[in-house]
């Protein structure tokens, strides 16, 4: 009998009686348990301005979890690409892959990942308001792929 590959999706929940550091410790423990149990992948999400969720920065969480585990693949489920410069996403995940070869997965999404005010703050903080970021999602994906390819960069602007 063949069993399906098992994965975990972690939002890093912060309970009402819990500090964020305790929630991160619980996620590290869960990742270690999933790794030891033979799970295939551990996904972390990206959500902003939600006090009950500590998963605001997938690359940072992935680095924390990769340092606490030995085998399990770690990925973003996903990075909300309209909120980030494609170059930054490509660099972050290339660096993670270099540090933890064969264990890093980049999952991306085009949703804002938050309420409109928070989405505006994320994009405005990156150097300007970009109301067309979601519409340009396909070109952002192409740019990330190009920047992560061994042949170099061919940006679409």
Question: What is each stretch, according to the model?
Answer:
Residues 75-83:
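The substrate-binding groove and active-site-proximal loops of carbohydrate-active enzymes
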Residues 2-20, 83-152:
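Flexible, glycine-rich active-site loops centered on histidine and acidic residues
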Residues 54-58, 82, 89:
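Generic structural signal for well-ordered secondary structure
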Residues 1-72:
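N-terminal beta1-alpha1-beta2 module of alpha/beta enzyme domains
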Residues 45, 77, 107-109:
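Structural motif
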Residues 153-157:
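Short, intrinsically disordered, charge-balanced linker/junction segments flanking boundaries
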Residues 42, 74, 104-106:
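Hydrophobic residues within beta-strands of alpha/beta enzymes
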């Amino acid at each position: 009998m063949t069993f399906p590959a098992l994965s975990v999706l972690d939002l890093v929940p912060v309970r009402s009686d819990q500090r964020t550091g305790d929630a991160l410790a619980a996620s590290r423990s869960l990742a270690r348990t999933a790794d030891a149990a033979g799970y295939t992948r551990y996904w972390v999400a990206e959500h902003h301005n939600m006090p009950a969720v500590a998963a605001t920065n997938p690359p940072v969480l992935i680095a924390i979890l990769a340092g606490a585990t030995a085998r399990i693949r770690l990925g973003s489920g996903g990075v909300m690409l309209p909120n980030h410069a494609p170059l930054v996403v490509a660099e972050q995940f290339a660096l993670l892959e270099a540090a933890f070869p064969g264990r890093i997965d980049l999952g991306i999404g085009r949703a804002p990942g938050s309420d409109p005010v928070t989405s505006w703050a994320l994009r405005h903080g990156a150097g300007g308001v970009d109301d067309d970021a979601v519409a340009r999602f396909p070109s952002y994906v192409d740019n990330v792929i190009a920047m992560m390819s061994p042949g170099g960069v061919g940006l679409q602007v």
